[in-house]
Amino acid sequence: MASPTVKLNSGYDMPLVGFGLWKVNNDTCADQIYHAIKEGYRLFDGACDYGNEVEAGQGIARAIKDGLVKREELFIVSKLWNSFHDGDRVEPICRKQLADWGIDYFDLYIVHFPISLKYVDPAVRYPPGWKSEKDELEFGNATIQETWTAMESLVDKKLARSIGISNFSAQLVMDLLRYARIRPATLQIEHHPYLTQTRLVEYAQKEGLTVTAYSSFGPLSFLELSVQNAVDSPPLFEHQLVKSIAEKHGRTPAQVLLRWATQRGIAVIPKSNNPQRLKQNLDVTGWNLEEEEIKAISGLDRGLRFNDPLGYGLYAPIF
């Protein structure tokens, strides 16, 4: 089963359902990607910060070697980390990430956060994480415009087919669109029934940016990180509304949450270690929720953001 695609403003087709690599363990990553390709996944959403790009590349190389897929059938996404926002740092780190994946180009390369941090030499620590070489949170001086101009040059040099942004506010998107020579193809944001970000989603879509949701299952991904508001929030899988809609359609709560997004044209990037759930997560486009059900799920919005630097004890108040 393959995922339907959405046409990006860059002209390329992007699968509506992909496999997210955040928190995928290094020792299982290659196998998980290989099996996901076998199940029909074609989009893989990685990042420098996830620390598993080498293993992800190994899984892809094996799948290509075994004839499961061709490179041009895959849609590989990675992200520019905060420590590399200076204009002259963008291309070198992108090339390093491409080498880690073992590929010549990214289908989509994204600015991970609208935060410039002080440069950390990859030879000193990689991935660098949030702290500088002094083990402190130190901000850099690069503007978004400087970073975006360097991102555009990646497209010119065919290192990235499309470029995008993540964790940007509507105000930052507005500003970026004033000077962008190449418009961002996508906006990736935390999006689930507890955090619908309706105005931001509508604005991005109106401007022709495809929205991708991460953390579609709400607090679930953040429990093991001991993020307090995630620990305090009722799991969406167990919410009576989500469960009753799932039972009515003969689906799982996870499928309902994913379909709530994809039915509104929002791409999703769930992950699962379970082969059955891997298959189920891909099956979230060929059936429909009723309009009233979508509205009811959206009504669960509580403005609850789980992926916030402040929640990890880092003073970067961007939200």
Swiss-Prot record:
Question: Which reaction does this chain catalyze?
Answer: xylitol + NAD(+) = D-xylose + NADH + H(+); xylitol + NADP(+) = D-xylose + NADPH + H(+)
Per the UniProt record, the site (Lowers pKa of active site Tyr) maps to 79
What are the glycosylated positions? 26, 141, 167
Which positions in this protein are listed as binding NAD(+)?
A: 166-167, 215-224, 271-281
Q: What is its EC number?
A: 1.1.1.307
Q: Which GO terms describe its biological process?
A: arabinose catabolic process; D-xylose catabolic process
Q: List the disulfide bonds.
A: none
Q: In which pathway does it act?
A: Carbohydrate metabolism; D-xylose degradation
Specify the protein name.
Probable NAD(P)H-dependent D-xylose reductase xyl1
Record organism: Aspergillus niger (strain ATCC MYA-4892 / CBS 513.88 / FGSC A1513)
Which lineage is the organism of this entry classified under, starting from the top rank?
A: Eukaryota, Fungi, Dikarya, Ascomycota, Pezizomycotina
